[in-house]
Amino acid sequence: SLPFGFPKVLVSSAAALPGLSTRFLRASDIFLFNSVIEIAGLTGLLRNVLDRAALVMTGMLHGPVTEPLTDRTKAIAMTMVSPCERCARAVRVQLEKEGYEVVGFHATGIGDRAMEAMISLGFFRGVIDLAPGGVGEHLYGFMRDAGPNRLESAGRMGIPQVISTCGVNHITPRKSKYTREHDLRRRYDLDRLRTWLRMSPRELKEVAALF
């Protein structure tokens, strides 16, 4: 619940557990410190870990840290993913020529949530939403799930929002949960680890209804 830019450090021996950091960090800009050893008994090793974590916090409190945004009236939020990088770059260049500061969010679900939260806090004057695929991902519970309030914050804040469609027609179920039907779909491989599957006509209609 602490705002973006407020110094935050979390020391945990479970920081590296799969899925745990995602569950607790969500859209927070918290510094996660993996202690490696259990936090029990002040041994020399644990003191070393805690000392370094304390120095991290000291640096954030007293170091020459740049303010999050120098002028919120010039800040524009923009979502993007790999397939629309060229478009995002062109949009950024044009807006910067007009004197705006463009803040990008990787639309992987967590990035979308972070953007919506920061819009609600008044960080931005406008939104360029190139990659709102998290809407459909939330509907079906897949990996880019951006939560139930995706696309809503800008309207509530009364700021302009331009919405495009990159990634809206694809889904990202975990490969370990692929069904036979998933294996038969057209696919788009972003890299060795990430694969998008084409939505069915029924799914496209269901997602379109949400927009």
Please identify what each model-predicted range represents:
Residues 19-83, 206:
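Cap/lid and interdomain-hinge subdomains that line or gate substrate/regulatory clefts
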Residues 73-109:
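Glycine-rich phosphate/diphosphate-binding loop of Rossmann-like nucleotide-binding domains
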Residues 1-6, 88-92, 141-146, 150:
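Short Gly/Thr/Asp-enriched flexible loops that form oxyanion-binding sites at enzyme active sites
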